[in-house]
Amino acid sequence: MMVRPTILIDMRKHRIRIHKHTLQAIGDPDFVMLIINPIEYTLGIKYGLPDDKLALRIRKSTLRNDYELYSTPLMAALHQLCPEWKERENYRLEGELIATENMAVFSMRDYTVVEH
């Protein structure tokens, strides 16, 4: 059985933690892109290319169990889209893999609150 792609959204630390198995599922990229669809309330993590200005570099030398991305503006945008998310909570999202696109998609309506 394959493990579902998983991310953790930490509103308090303004962080998205992308689990290592999620990165492996989308092709173990050196760069990723985050895609937010506000109409469908989804967040996508896609294999990125180095020449794409929106791609974020994954530093493999520091990668252990997950990749952490810190962004106050991104968290503010997510909070605006999901006002029920509290600023001091952590949210685990399990998504679906779209293998043909090297992408994982997460519904922001389907989450679990994680205790600190």
Which residues fall in each region the model found?
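Solvent-exposed loop and beta-edge segments used for protein-protein assembly and interaction
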Residues: 10, 26-28, 98-100
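Short beta-strand-centered segments at strand-helix junctions
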Residues: 15-27, 70-78
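Glycine-rich loop/turn
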Residues: 1-13
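Long compositionally biased, domain-poor regions of proteins
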Residues: 16-18, 28, 32-35, 42-47
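Mature exported/compartmentalized surface modules and terminal targeting/interaction regions
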Residues: 3, 39, 46-116
